[in-house]
Design a protein with these regions (language model features):
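Exported/periplasmic ABC-transporter solute-binding proteins
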Residues: 27-94, 105-122, 131-320
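Sec/Tat signal peptide C-region and signal peptidase I cleavage site
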Residues: 22-25
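Bacterial N-terminal signal peptides that target proteins for export
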Residues: 1-11
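Bacterial N-terminal signal peptides
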Residues: 10-20
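Serine-hydrolase catalytic machinery in alpha/beta-hydrolase-like enzymes
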Residues: 126-128
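Mobile, glycine-rich extracellular loop/lid and propeptide segments
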Residues: 102
């Protein structure tokens, strides 16, 4: 079990030493600015684990940064922090030592909490707009159940039970609900649909991990036979494993066997961002505004998909 712990300032300071690895994994440039000839303007991101993925080949944010930088050669975007949403928020609240400019969370509640309870830490992302704009929605995700046994049909077993079955699987991996919105969604499914007794942190059937990527890794490593993960982790060019394979999508609302009766699995996983107060040059503020506009361009057919819509579809997200 992983207990939910707030990081100390010392731990956050230690994270500065490894922050360059986040940027390297995201495949982006350094900490440029608009000062000096030939230097590029840069902004720093903190990104929730599900949207960070596993760069460079399976990462929604890396794809988006590459598209944005290709269209804007004077700009760079660097991921300096990634992890569970609550962990990233804690880093920002406790000094923002990684100098984050934009926080992309896996929920709407955390950016809203920063806006209401830590207003001195946030900034409008479009200063010319009246009234000022602070938070914005950029994606909606989906929860999925994943097995580490190829060929396992999670849609229905021989007894007719579909999806997760506490009588069949010794343990199930989830992200820590106190830290990760996808963990909250998994908790809602396990308690509300499968009648597991709370608190899940002390339930021997449940293994909690510090973020959704760690839960996915636990299933792949066969630490747990199944786990609730983000759909984006198992999505390939807009398609996810279908019935008869080792994964099953859990949408927030599903049809049931009873006509006109819906199953409410969890609250929709709408993901929001918020600009963080930092010492930025006018050029960096302009870049920040441009990047938010890029992330919120949901243009789709009949006109060609925007880069944002192309990326959302590729990783099985939808527009919020």
């Amino acid at each position: 079990m992983f207990a939910a712990k707030q990081l100390t300032l010392g731990a956050i300071a230690g994270a500065i030493f490894i922050s360059s690895s986040f940027a390297a994994r995201a495949g982006n440039g350094g900490y440029g600015g608009d000062e000096g000839y030939g230097k590029k303007t840069n902004i720093n991101l903190a990104v929730a684990s599900n949207f960070y993925g596993v760069p460079p080949s399976n990462s929604a944010i890396t794809d988006l940064i590459n598209s944005f930088e290709a269209a804007n050669p004077k700009y760079t975007v660097t991921v300096v922090d990634n992890g569970a949403t609550a962990t990233l928020a804690s880093h920002i609240i406790n000094g923002n030592l990684l100098k984050v400019d934009l926080f992309l969370a896996a929920d709407t509640a955390t950016p809203q909490d920063l806006l209401i309870n830590h207003f001195n830490l946030v900034a409008p992302y479009n200063s010319s707009h009246t009234p000022p704009l602070y938070t914005f929605n950029y994606a909606q995700g989906v929860l999925a159940l994943l097995s580490n046994t190829p060929g396992v049909d999670l849609s229905c077993d021989t007894s007719g039970t579909c999806g997760y079955d506490p009588k069949v699987y010794s343990t199930v991996a989830i992200a820590d609900p106190s830290l990760a919105p996808y963990g909250v969604a998994a908790q809602s499914v396990l308690i509300g649909r499968y009648d597991l007794m709370p608190p899940l942190s002390s339930n021997p059937l449940v293994h909690e991990y510090p973020n959704i990527t760690a839960a996915y890794d636990a299933v792949i490593a066969k630490t747990d036979p199944v786990g609730f993960v983000t759909m984006s982790a198992i999505c390939s060019n807009g398609s996810y494993p279908t019935s008869g394979t080792s994964a099953l999508a859990y949408f927030s609302i599903e049809s049931s066997s009873i006509p006109s009766v819906l199953i409410n699995n969890y609250n929709p996983l709408t993901q929001a961002g918020i600009a963080i107060r930092n010492r930025r040059t006018p050029a960096q503020n302009t870049e920040l505004d441009a990047f938010v506009a890029f992330l919120t361009d949901f243009t789709s057919p009949p006109t060609p998909d925007s880069p944002m819509m192309t990326t959302l579809k590729k990783y099985c997200y939808s527009a919020p």
